[in-house]
Amino acid sequence: MLALSLAVGDILEENRVNVYYTRTEDVYESPVQKALEGNAVGADYFVSIHRNASPYSNQYTGVATYVYSLFGQAARLAESINARLEQVGFANQGINEAPQLAVLNRTQMPTVLVEVGYINTDADNELLDARFDDAARAIAEGILDIL
């Protein structure tokens, strides 16, 4: 999801938002390391972009967003991003509370983890391939909506 994250960042920067990346190359960083990097730069928000997976191919479809708590600014950000991705064509699986996730419980700012479709679902892959730019714009606009 690095390419999608970079595309989202480009759109945000075009809209005069300062963007910090935990990585710009395809190298692994642990969720804790990512959270600590976000804290170190004093980010106002932290958005972690991923693809979901299920035990069986084509079992599930759609976008899901995870937050530390269903209340507060992170939940509003998640709602905004999900709604925008739903307009692109992704099924909206909603917002999930997941305080056990390190990237959510180690950050000091409102944080969301966005799962943009299922990597093992053909329909989600086809949608993301066909509407990659729209998905990037949707995530960026979901962020801009709450700034």
For each predicted feature, which ranges?
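Active-site-proximal helix/loop segments of hydrolytic enzymes
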Residues: 2-147
